[in-house]
Amino acid sequence: MEEKLEQAYLYDFYGELLNEHQRQVYEDFVFNDLSLGEIASEEGISRQGVADLIKRCNKKLLDYEAKLHLVEKFMSIKSDIRRIHELTNDFKKSHNELLMNEIEAISNQILEEL
């Protein structure tokens, strides 16, 4: 997964676990696409301080993911739903019962994961 996209997913799931200052700096870097220098000027800290803070935030978010696996589960379910969508379209064309069996198996797997 692209680094910025991964950072966005991690933030979406775990961002509220960061303190307000960490969230602001992380949002400015990841979502608002501000440079380290721009953030440093805005926050009144050094560029190195901003870089260190972003690195610590990334580590925290990755640690949460390592323990909770919410992004991993989300991506897995998203992939399964995409596959169900494809199979449904195929079924509309062919009316093949085997496709319905596969859809049922995937949906059962999703329910077990939840």
Curated annotation (Swiss-Prot):
Organism expressing this protein natively: Agathobacter rectalis (strain ATCC 33656 / DSM 3377 / JCM 17463 / KCTC 5835 / VPI 0990)
> How is this protein named in the record?
UPF0122 protein EUBREC_1504
Kindly list the cysteine pairs connected by disulfide bridges. Answer: none
Function noted in UniProt: Might take part in the signal recognition particle (SRP) pathway. This is inferred from the conservation of its genetic proximity to ftsY/ffh. May be a regulatory protein.
Record-stated family: Belongs to the UPF0122 family.
NCBIfam families recorded for this chain?
Answer: YlxM (NF045758)
Superkingdom, natural source = Bacteria
- Pfam short name (any one): UPF0122
